[in-house]
Amino acid sequence: MIPKVLIIIPAYNEEKNIEKVVRNIEENFSQYDYIIVNDGSTDSTKDVLERNHFHYLDLPQNLGIGGGVQTGYKYADANGYDIAIQIDGDGQHDPAFIAQLIQPILDGQADMVIGSRFLEKEGFQTSSMRRLGIRYFKHLLHALCGVTITDATSGFRASSAALTRYFTKDYAEDYPEPEAILSSVLNGFQVMEIPVVMRERQGGESSINALKSVYYMIKVTLAIIISRIRFWRKREKPCF
């Protein structure tokens, strides 16, 4: 039986990138469905989507990456998809790795599979500051729930139908990737990584700067610790 796979593409002000990303999927990976979630873009992203007759959902205001991705998960769950794939709308993630992302889910080995640029350290490795932050989250997650994830902030990931349904009810609003790993593990879902090669952003500017990076680390750290404490109180015992 061929699995029903949906690619979720959250997009905020990606007028310079989104057409290339979607054209690549349509022309080379047509076996997968896709949905773009236009997260209240203030540039001409929506015009690009309409002009090209792309499949998209239009949010009336910016909900942040978490809200955009969760909207995609709700769409996937409502339409009966077996696997939901998240990729960024800036061209960094290569859909050629999707087959490798979904295979562990099909084999029953995982509920979430994350594409890591650090397992084989090929391709674009991001800035030294971001690498430091990613390494920090690797150790934090290991300390809190025992899982070792080398690329916890990677937005290139696949989720099973069961995990997708869970995310429709519980998903962090802002900078959700590390927290989604923690909540998945604590709730009994299996999480693993595979090596992928990522590219530099294809155009435009990232919304993450040095100041936002510091804010991101503080906010996500607090969110993860609070989530872990709440789970501990709920179960009355730690998971490690």
Residue ranges and their predicted role:
Residues 4-6, 33, 179:
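Cell-envelope/extracellular polymer assembly enzymes that use nucleotide-activated donors
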Residues 6-10, 36, 58:
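Short hydrophobic beta-strand elements that form part
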Residues 13-27:
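Short, well-formed alpha-helical segments that are part of the catalytic scaffolds
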Residues 14-17, 41, 94:
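Donor nucleotide-sugar binding loop of glycosyltransferases
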Residues 38-46, 91:
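A conserved acidic beta->alpha catalytic loop
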Residues 59-61, 65-78, 95-174, 201-222, ...:
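Acceptor/aglycone-binding surface of glycosyltransferases and processive sugar-polymer synthases
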Residues 81-92:
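Short beta-strand-to-loop acidic/aromatic patch adjacent to the donor-nucleotide binding site
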Residues 147-148, 169-172, 181-199:
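Catalytic donor-sugar/metal-binding loop of nucleotide-sugar-dependent glycosyltransferases
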